[in-house]
């Protein structure tokens, strides 16, 4: 094969050609071969570790699992927190369960047309400082298995709290460990709103007692946003809503 100017710079990666009885290979193909060789060496080193790791099972984050996540914001409030103390976020006295708010949420997220099951529930709290340029961290303590008749204190002394996660958002898994049996939640909610939470929600999910504090040595004003996050499993309706040639 004679000399050809078109073969000086190959348009195809990894192609070879023969010019004056000499074999030529594109530089990109050579660099790719070096990269692939490094990848094969790295895979050979980690392969024994992966063989051992395949024998173990680890739990995944249930928040990122299958299902639809829906949120209801219970309240937003500004609180004053004293140093070296933790303040109760909510005592479940009733302001978290306003009928107008929950009725709108249930009717929008749990329609009658589909069967929906609550797979899991989280208590989410988001905290932000009210004053700018404040350098402190947020601390937190919570309890799940408190007795129903226990009256929590509004303020407790900070003893071995932990820091709230990234972006000042913390989620607490409230699932007790067994499945939530109800399928048509809106009809149950409409039938007995007064006893819905005590008879339907809390038997299957924990009612947390959450305390929030700061690492500041001064009294700080913080903004709390408290929400419930539901993971919902949806099922198709049993029968079509309409009958006719178009359906």
Swiss-Prot record:
InterPro entries: Polyhedrin (IPR001746). The keyword Protein biosynthesis does not apply. Keywords: Viral occlusion body. It holds the Pfam family Polyhedrin. One of its GO terms (cellular component) is viral occlusion body. One of its GO terms (molecular function) is structural molecule activity. The keyword NAD does not apply. Component of the virus occlusion bodies, which are large proteinaceous structures, that protect the virus from the outside environment for extended periods until they are ingested by insect larvae. Belongs to the polyhedrin family. This is Granulin. It comes from Pieris brassicae granulosis virus.
